[in-house]
A protein has these predicted regions:
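Flexible glycine-rich beta->alpha loop in the catalytic core of nucleotide-sugar glycosyltransferases
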Residues: 29, 126, 133
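Short, well-structured N-terminal submotif of metal-dependent ribonuclease cores
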Residues: 1-49, 58-75
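Active-site neighborhoods of divalent-metal-dependent phosphate/nucleic-acid chemistry enzymes
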Residues: 2-13, 82-128
C-alpha cells in the first residue's frame, strides 16, 4: 500500500531513472527497498513511462473483485500523481534499432519492454527493473535492480 513520504526536493547525483512496471507494482504495495531507493535518489530523479501507466491500469482491470479493483485504482492514481509521466517521443529509430538487433541475435523481448527501453535511451534514463533479463540484451541501455 502507498503510504510513504518522499521529499521531492532531495536529489542525489545527476542520474535519472525510468521505473519499470514491476518496480511500480512493488512501490504500490509498499516495498521498503524500492521506497528507500526513491528517497535516496530523490523523487524528482524518477519518472514513469506512459507504457507502464497502461500496464498498471490493465492489471487493475484484471483484479478478482470490485473491492480490490477500487483499491488498486486508488493506489495507481496516488502513484501517478507523484511522478513525472514520460510520453512516447518520436523514437521509431530507437525502437526499430532495438527490435532488429535483438531479433538478429535470437532474443525475443516484450514489445512494451522495447518501447520502455527506447524511451530510456531517447531521454538518457536508467531503467529500474527487477526483470533485468527482459532488458539486458539491449545495447547501451543502463539498468538497475532495486
Amino acid at each position: 500500500m502507498i503510504g510513504w513520504q518522499i521529499n521531492s526536493a532531495v536529489t542525489m547525483g545527476n542520474r535519472r531513472y525510468l521505473l519499470d512496471t514491476n518496480v511500480l507494482i512493488e512501490l504500490i504495495h509498499g516495498n521498503r527497498t524500492v521506497i528507500n531507493h526513491i528517497i535516496d535518489v530523490g523523487i524528482s530523479s524518477c519518472a514513469i513511462s506512459v507504457i507502464s501507466v497502461h500496464e498498471l491500469y490493465y492489471g487493475a482491470y484484471n483484479t478478482p473483485s470490485e473491492k480490490y479493483f477500487i483499491q488498486e485504482m486508488n493506489r495507481i492514481k496516488m502513484l501517478l500523481s507523484r511522478f513525472k509521466i514520460i510520453s512516447l517521443p518520436e523514437m521509431p529509430d530507437d525502437y526499430g534499432r532495438i527490435k532488429t538487433s535483438l531479433r538478429l541475435h535470437g532474443h525475443i523481448v516484450d514489445e512494451f519492454d522495447m518501447m520502455i527501453a527506447g524511451q530510456a535511451l531517447f531521454y538518457g534514463l536508467t531503467v529500474v527493473t527487477n526483470n533485468l533479463k527482459h532488458f539486458r540484451d539491449i545495447e547501451n541501455l543502463k539498468l538497475e535492480d532495486w
